[in-house]
Amino acid sequence: MTKPLRIGIVAGELSGDTLGEGFIKSIKAQYPDAEFVGIGGPKMIAQGCDSLFDMEELAVMGLVEVLGRLPRLLKVKAELVRYFTQNPPDVFIGIDAPDFNLRLEKTLKDNGIKTVHYVSPSVWAWRPKRIFKIDAATDLVLAFLPFEKAFYDKYNVACEFIGHTLADAIPMETDKIAARDLLGLEQEREWLAVLPGSRGGEVALIAKPFIETCQRIHKQHPNMGFVVAAVNEKRREQFETIWKATAPELDFVIIQDTARNVMTAADAVLLASGTVALECMLVKRPMVVGYQVNKLTGWIAQKLSITEFVSLPNVLAGKELVQEFIQEECHPDFLYPAMEKVLNNDNRELIEKFTEMHQWIRKDADKQAANAVLRLINKETAE
């Protein structure tokens, strides 16, 4: 009797738990007896993953927080190394969380276990020399975007472009009317979605210039509605405080819902850079991108950066499709004219380009990831 397929897997945050869930489902569709063990969140556990530690153990952000938790993180890593070397899986998958997973993958690879890193770190954008560490730690990288694979190919590092899970999740055509109904927004108004970031540090720097931009837009478009996506109660309160101090006369509808629903309900979007810009492209809404970090972080990022663009739609297109304003340029003097241009344009060509790019990265990423891993360990795949 053949032994069931055994896969080691570690996800470090909620987004990784979602990727892990889809990956496990796709493997089990082909190998129903497959076993999964490592660290997962509630979604992975519901699919049958045996989680040896709570995923929260790995969910630390920022240098100070990481330093405070370092002894515990090192202990978890040592325990996982001991477990997997004593009970070797057919393959180990590290999902995102590169600071933790790449170190774990390197040790496991050195012990003869095949390793895969799922979600490429942004080596194509900054600190490109990390690619040598990735090569030493992995047998294969699974990349969401085609330019990531092109970067790995340049260095002869094994990588497969699997498409993006967001491109699979978001329909080719989104329903603005249904989104407005869902969020309770007036159908007959024009709406601008405002997304000033999901982290406290982002909102602290980006909300004010975004609100001041809305002030200027309101003068030209007095009937325009402004709808803000807040990821949680803390960000809602933070935005409200900045709004009341900056432009109390303006009306904002603040919604604690997914950014995707808020963008779908809007006619145009003013957003902080990040995955949300890709999501905005996929819901086919014209956008202007603004981003700001503290001056020291910005200076360091500028020195280490190797890309011309910050927002994913532009990086993906290899040219400026959407205007982006970074650091000092994240100011109403720049944001307002760009936003006016978007609001006074039919944006048809841009939406056509967004649709073309959506099709390009829509490949059933869960299935592609599963098949790439199965090929690595010489298992049959359902193409």
Curated annotation (Swiss-Prot):
PANTHER family reported for this sequence: LIPID-A-DISACCHARIDE SYNTHASE, LIPID-A-DISACCHARIDE SYNTHASE, MITOCHONDRIAL-RELATED
Pathway: Bacterial outer membrane biogenesis; LPS lipid A biosynthesis
Enzyme class: transferase
Lipid metabolism found in the keyword field: yes
InterPro entries cross-referenced by the UniProt entry: Glyco_trans_19 (IPR003835)
Originating species: Aliivibrio fischeri (strain ATCC 700601 / ES114) (Vibrio fischeri)
GO BP, sorted A to Z: lipid A biosynthetic process
Function (record text): Condensation of UDP-2,3-diacylglucosamine and 2,3-diacylglucosamine-1-phosphate to form lipid A disaccharide, a precursor of lipid A, a phosphorylated glycolipid that anchors the lipopolysaccharide to the outer membrane of the cell.
UniProt protein name: Lipid-A-disaccharide synthase
Family named by the database record: Belongs to the LpxB family.
One Pfam short name: LpxB
Entry GO MF terms: lipid-A-disaccharide synthase activity; phospholipid binding
Transmembrane segments: none
Reactions listed under catalytic activity: a lipid X + a UDP-2-N,3-O-bis[(3R)-3-hydroxyacyl]-alpha-D-glucosamine = a lipid A disaccharide + UDP + H(+)
GO cellular component: membrane
Annotated EC: 2.4.1.182
Cross-referenced HAMAP family: LpxB (MF_00392)
Keyword vocabulary terms for this entry: Glycosyltransferase, Lipid A biosynthesis, Lipid biosynthesis, Lipid metabolism, Transferase
